[in-house]
Design a protein with these regions (language model features):
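Short, small-residue-biased leader/transition segments that mark boundaries at the very start
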Residues: 1-3
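Transmembrane beta-strand segments of Gram-negative outer membrane beta-barrel proteins
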Residues: 7-34, 49-59, 215-217, 535
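Outer-membrane beta-barrel translocator/receptor signature
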Residues: 27-45, 49-57, 61-67, 73-81, ...
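Exposed, low-structure sequence patches enriched in small/polar residues
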Residues: 36-40, 201-232, 239-545
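Outer-membrane beta-barrel proteins
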Residues: 62-80, 134-141, 194-197, 424-432
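Outer membrane beta-barrel
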Residues: 75-131, 137-170, 287-304, 450-466
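Surface-exposed loop/turn segments flanking beta-strands in extracellular/periplasmic regions
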Residues: 117-128, 174-190, 475-480
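Aromatic- and glycine-enriched pocket-lining scaffold segments that form the walls
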Residues: 142-188, 197-209
């Protein structure tokens, strides 16, 4: 009855949105001469329907640059199609997802398809993700599940979640075995197209959670299998990686709050190894937070869909202690400091033995006025890396210092400015230091009466090599995040216009160009660009009805 009434109300009061995007480059990569099968234009179309915050539905279609449209392996038009339906809070049914969806339970040691933006940002917004079923409305072609998932309230304190997924994956099959899984979603060349949808993966599992007053407990389990054995080459640092054709992970998550203390964690096991992450947060006084995080990911623990806090990109082969503190002891000032001590019990990429490292960060933010703010951030990181020289291959420490100053200023609602200065210093034992500099200026203007908004940004960068590279975040299109990196010497400029004709029509266009002053070629291989300039334009149209 609830679902029928919800659909009737949705048909009458629901909101529709159509969003399309085009990216057009003004340069030609080498791959378009003989290798890539389609045009260099990127295009996506997204239709979404929403009723309040309780019903979502949508379709996504996407073609990456270089992929054919309506031809060859994409004879049905786009390279990627996605459908999703999410129903929330319908009586005892707390969530029901059909089509493409995402999952996150506990601290992510068993399963999490959330987007994480780095260790420091993750720690500062570290929350338990127990019982979250979400729609997959992005054009990400790998990090999702396809099937059905649901959460039901068994009682006031107990929730039960279950899910099933069946989907095709890209990869390489050799002699009847899967030797690699291809995660980029790119099918531009015949070689890439031959990897498309070669094998299937089925996954099923569930979560039981209990929450009463200050206590929260949960158990999450998943079982997944491929239709062919997964047998990648296991040598060196990858010796303990995933292999076989059926796998499982089981985890227990827990949380408890007492006065100013908050404790959360999860412990999980797999076919081999185990992992545990525990976090204690304490607020001694108002406007002060102290956080302690301990993680232990054994070298032979493997969870294909895990994503959690750490220095590395996987919840494997890492252990460490993290402490962070944020405080505002007096008016206008905010301070953040953190220190992470970590180690890797087994080999890693470019490190042929167990290694260790440290990561420290200090940031001071000063906001004397609502229209004026600034911060100074310093980060120090020490890790180890293999270096090959006259004495053979040695594992030596490397040191990375990063310094950033940013000033934000606004002149009413019409004009705002952001100035950023970056400095990088990278060196290793017995080797000369490499340095990187960057100056970035952004000016944003708003004309509300004309419904026109404009951003102009320019950067000058000068780095010695890749290790001393710099980053610059830019305003972009809706639902996108763009932070390119630069190495060498040159400048980058971008201009973005956003025009709202009315509450139904929105148009955004962005032009960007990067010019290198120290080279006549950009990139390598099929991505090689002849010349020192790289320019493109992006356009996006949104229609609400």
């Amino acid at each position: 009855m609830c679902i029928r009434d919800r659909l009737k109300s949705a048909a009458k009061y629901g909101k529709n949105e159509l969003l399309t995007r085009f990216d057009i480059p003004f340069y030609k990569r080498k791959g378009y001469e003989h290798t890539y099968l389609g045009p260099s234009v990127y295009n996506s179309v997204k239709y979404s329907f929403r009723y309040s915050d309780r019903l979502y539905a949508g379709v996504v279609a996407e073609k990456d640059a270089g992929e054919p449209f309506g031809a060859l392996h994409n004879r049905y038009g786009y390279d990627y199609y996605s459908f999703y339906l999410l129903l929330k809070d319908c009586g005892r049914l707390k969530a029901l997802a059909v089509g493409n969806y995402r999952l996150s339970f506990g601290q992510g040691l068993v399963i999490s398809t959330d987007y994480l933006m780095g260790k420091t940002i993750y720690a500062s917004s570290f929350n338990n993700r127990s019982g979250r079923i979400k729609k997959h409305s992005s054009s990400d072609e790998y990090n999702y599940f396809r099937g059905v998932a649901a959460t039901v309230a068994l009682s006031k304190d107990w929730d039960l979640s279950g899910f099933y997924s069946h989907r095709l994956l890209d990869g390489v099959i050799t002699d009847g075995a899967i030797t690699s899984i291809y995660k980029t979603g790119l099918h531009r060349s015949q070689k890439e197209a031959d990897k498309k949808n070669l094998f299937t993966m089925q996954l099923t599992g569930g979560n039981v959670s209990y929450q009463h007053n200050r206590i929260r407990l949960g158990i999450t389990g998943i079982y997944y299998l491929f239709n062919q054995p997964y047998e990648p080459e296991l040598t060196g640092y990858s010796k303990y990686n995933l292999h076989g054709n059926n796998f499982y992970n089981l985890g227990i998550d827990y949380a408890y709050r007492w006065h100013r203390f908050s404790f959360q964690g999860e412990t999980a096991i797999g076919k081999q190894g185990w992992a545990s992450l525990n976090r204690l947060q304490y607020s001694p006084v108002q406007n002060t937070q102290i956080m302690l995080i301990h993680r232990f990911y054994s070298y032979n623990y493997w969870a294909m869909f895990a994503h959690s806090f750490g220095e590395g990109s996987t919840t494997q082969n890492e252990q460490g202690y993290y402490i962070g503190m944020e405080t505002s002891p007096f008016a206008y000032w905010k301070f953040f400091a953190s220190f992470d001590l970590f180690s890797f019990p087994w080999k890693k990429y470019r490190v042929n033995k167990p290694s260790r490292g440290t990561d420290g960060l200090l940031q001071a933010t000063f906001t004397p006025r609502s229209h004026l703010s600034m911060y100074l951030k310093y980060r120090y990181k020490r890790k180890e890396r293999d270096w090959t020289g006259s004495k053979g291959t040695l594992t030596l420490p490397i040191f990375h210092h990063q310094l950033r100053y940013r000033l934000n200023y606004s002149l009413g609602d019409v004009l705002s400015s952001r100035t950023t200065l970056d400095y990088n210093h990278f060196h290793s034992q017995d080797r000369a230091a490499n340095k990187g500099y960057q100056v970035t200026q952004m000016i944003s203007s708003q004309l509300p009466w004309a419904r026109l908004f404009a951003d102009v940004q320019g950067s000058y960068f000068f780095t010695d090599d890749y290790d001393s590279r710099v980053y610059a975040s830019e305003s972009g299109l809706l639902y996108t995040f763009y932070t390119p990196s630069f190495q060498g010497r040159g400048f980058r400029c971008s201009v973005r216009f956003r025009y709202e004709l009315n509450k139904h029509w929105l148009f955004i266009t962005k032009f960007g160009e990067t010019v290198y002053l120290d080279r006549n070629e950009i990139g390598s291989g099929n991505d090689l660009i002849c010349g020192n300039k790289k320019a493109d334009v992006q356009m996006q149209l949104r229609i609400k009805f």
